[in-house]
C-alpha cells in the first residue's frame, strides 16, 4: 500500500500520490485520508471535502482521492504498467508560501516616549495581558510561492528613514528595543539570535525642526 505527498519544483505544486486500487469508489471500504484544518494549510488547493472545524477526531478535511480521467501517475520506482498503478491529486495552484509561519516583523520599545498601539491580548505569547505596545516598525516580509519562501526573509525599506514622533520633556537615559515576529493567527514571539549571528538596528534621534530636511520635498 503506497501513498505520499510529492513536491514538483517545476510547477511549485504539491501532489498526493496514491494507489488507485485502494481508492476505487466501488469498493465497500475505500481508503480515506483525513487531516485537521491546521495541517491542511500546507496542502491547500488539493481536491478535498470539508467536514468541520477543530473536530474532536481531527477529521476536518477529507482528501477527495479519485480517478479524474487524466491523473494517472507512473511511479519511477516501479515497473511501468497500463493503466498506471497510481493516481495523482495535484494542487490547483501553488501554496508553498503557507509553509512560512511569519506574517510580520515588529520592532518594539517599551521605554521610548511614543504613542502605543493597541493589540489583542492573545498576541503576546509571554505575558498574555499586555494590550498596548510601542511599535517602532511593523513590516510584512516579501514571501513568494517559490522555494525561497523557506530560506530567508528580507525587509525592503520604502525610504531612508522611518520617522516617529516622540513626546514629553523627560530626559531619556535608557533605550530598549525588542524584535518580534508574528504568525498568521496574530501570535507574537521574541526573535532569538543564534550563536554567531547578529541583528543590527539603527536609531537616530533628530530634532523635529530638522526632520523636514530628511524628507524629499517634491
UniProtKB/Swiss-Prot annotation:
Gene3D superfamilies, per the entry: 2.60.120.1100
Compartments reported by the entry: Virion
GO cellular component annotations of the record: virion component
Keywords: Virion
InterPro entries assigned to the protein according to its UniProt record, in alphabetical order: V18/19-like_jelly_roll_sf (IPR049413)
Major localization listed first in the record, in broad terms: virion
Protein known as: Structural protein V19
Organism this protein belongs to: Sputnik virophage
